[in-house]
Each structure stands twice: as structure tokens, then as C-alpha cells.
Amino acid sequence: MATNFLVHEKIWFDKFKYDDAERRFYEQMNGPVAGASRQENGASVILRDIARARENIQKSLAGTSGPGASSGPSGDHSELVVRIASLEVENQSLRGVVQELQQAISKLEARLNVLEKSSPGHRATAPQTQHVSPMRQVEPPAKKPATPAEDDEDDDIDLFGSDNEEEDKEAAQLREERLRQYAEKKAKKPALVAKSSILLDVKPWDDETDMAQLEACVRSIQLDGLVWGASKLVPVGYGIRKLQIQCVVEDDKVGTDLLEEEITKFEEHVQSVDIAAFNKI
């Protein structure tokens, strides 16, 4: 009775094996990739687990094929078939992953080979440059000092000496002629004479002084370089007027002191002389 009860009971006794196989599979999928050999070992372990599970299923099916087996439910067999199918699918996917890893490893190896070939150690050495020594500078041969005999011979031969002397004489004469002409031209040119315009104030003694006679006395002064100009009578005050007269003088010949001395000589009419304005021309 106890055996028949266990046969009809839906208990999966080998579930821990499938759990272990599934755990190892996901550990291999999520863990670090150590190489193609490690992946192949994991795949072989899964395959062995699947084969062992198949054997156990077959044994369990053979055990339930005895008397009373037909009365057992068919749901267990369908679940086992579905589970086996899923494991086969996972097996195929795992094989694809292993193949992709192998291809990636082969590509990495090819890349490493290319990098090793292109490294400086494998490069061809550059051709050595030849050392060229600098060229020695060739010094020109030193000239031998001329002997006194050769100097005498050179002095004796003068093909154009006479012509040079004649040209020097002509150039000297031409230079003297031009200097003489320049001196004559400069002598004929009138020299600039410095002149000044002076405005004088001649004051009488009083209002009874004859201003016409005073002006005549002033204009009677004749000096070399003196030219008298316009004049006028300017009232001073109290009926007294002063004579304001303009003159142009050459600075080298006539000075203001000389003019004052000459005008003040007329003591009867002139009291004083002042310079009202002085301008250079």
C-alpha cells in the first residue's frame, strides 16, 4: 500500500540535480570568461547532468510501467518532456555562446599578432647615415712680395701718365674759374642792411615855443643812414604840444644815442627827447 501511494504521488525526487545544473549554467553565463576550455568543461558537465537526468527518467518510467502504472496520471510525463525540451534548447544556446566566444578569442589572437608585428622591436631598422666630414677650406696661395727690380720696371712704364697730369691741370683751372665767378657774383649782390623804424617824442620848454621852428631844427639833422618821415603835433596839457616824428635808420650807421645828442643840441627849443616806439624792419 505504501509503494502504491508513492507511485501515485506527484513528487520530483531528482529536482535538486536539475537545480544544481541550472545554477552552474547561470554561473557560467554570468561569471567572468576564463577561456574557451572552461566554457567547454561547463558545457560537458551540463550535458552529463542532462544524460543522467534522462537515465533517471527512464528508470522512473520503467518502475512505473508495472501493475497499477496505467492508473497514474499522465501529467508527470508531459512535465518531464517539457523540461527535457527546455534543457535541450538551453544546451543549443550554450553551444552558440561557446562558438561566439571561440570566434572572439581567435579575433583577439589575430589582433595581438598584428600588434606584435607592428611593435618597434619588429620594425626594420633605418639605414645608417654616413658621416660626412666637413670640407677643409683651401687657403689661396700667398702672394710673393714684389722685388725692388719689378717695382722699378713698373715705375718706368707709364702709358697714361701724361694724360692724367693734363686732366688734373684742366680740372684745377676750371675749379679756380668757378670760384672766381662765384666771388664776383657775391660781391655784386647787395648786402642786406639792418634797419629800424623809430618814433621820437620831442618836447618843448613851454607853450610859447615855436613848434614849426623846432621841427625845422630836427629835420635839419642829416646823417648817413638817416631818413626822416612823417610828423605831427600831439597835445600834452596846459596848451603845450610835443612833436612826434618818425625816422628810419640803418643800425650799423645811426644809433638812438646819436639821434638824442643831435636833437638836444637845439637847447633853445628842445627840452627832452624820448623814444616812443622802436621796430626792426
Curated annotation (Swiss-Prot):
The modification Phosphothreonine is found at T129, T147. PROSITE patterns: EF1BD_1, EF1BD_2. InterPro entries: eEF-1beta-like_sf, EF-1_beta_acid_region_euk, EF1B_bsu/dsu, EF1B_bsu/dsu_GNE, Transl_elong_EF1B/ribsomal_bS6, Transl_elong_EF1B_B/D_CS. Keywords: Acetylation, DNA-binding, Elongation factor, Nucleus, Phosphoprotein, Protein biosynthesis, Transcription, Transcription regulation. GO terms for molecular function: DNA binding; guanyl-nucleotide exchange factor activity; translation elongation factor activity. Residues 149-169 have a biased composition (Acidic residues). SUPFAM superfamilies: eEF-1beta-like. The modification N6-succinyllysine is found at K117. The keyword Transmembrane does not apply. Residues 173-281 are annotated as: Catalytic (GEF). Belongs to the EF-1-beta/EF-1-delta family. This is Elongation factor 1-delta. It comes from Macaca fascicularis. The lineage of its organism: Eukaryota, Metazoa, Chordata, Craniata, Vertebrata.
